[in-house]
């Protein structure tokens, strides 16, 4: 949506509110609640934030950007996609930072995306599961390690990497006490859904030195820098070549690769069906246990 169209749409909405107040003699006319809010935390992410925002724009009713003091062009890029940009000083706790971001979201559902990630073009197939009774949809994340010949890590630390990213906007759902790799609370029932995909760009954008610095920062915050995840070169299971600091348009380079396009648009029905069945079995078992108590 262009800036002109967006402003025109907002003015029409405002006009409808005023007319409704006059006709129906109401104090406040409440507009319909947005369906999907997208939350992205940022700080100096000018190299990747455009990929994240561009990928979610077709699906988001609102995009919330929570920044903690960017000094580069991150906010300039974010302003092209949303006017809902907030600032909160980072106090060494990612869980608290995300909880603040969640409080700014008004949609019925919230999708949390990291600033160095993007979603595949089949994300819409994931959204159909939002009406199936779950409070949380867990998605698979793939850590891309090469764009010259599309590949992602398949080591134990990187695959399967299930991420709790689609959550119902429920005040009972929040991030817990973990300072790093924060843990979501009160998210059941949850579905592991292999329909849409999240792609992680960290290994393309950052060389070994930058990733080692990040791992050390996380270790300082929480006593666990997750070196197996961020520094696979140090471990014997590392077998894939990584292409660091690639050409500026990563998505264009990736989508020239036919195998990536096929992967991006693929939905693994078997995994999703398996997880749905597991949830149904757990539900039935819980009902049976409750019945037996009486």
Regions found by a protein language model. Give the residues of each.
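Acidic helix N-cap motif at the loop->helix transition within catalytic regions
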Residues: 50, 72-81, 122
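Catalytic-site signature of metal-activated, phosphate-bearing donor transferases
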Residues: 95-102, 120-290
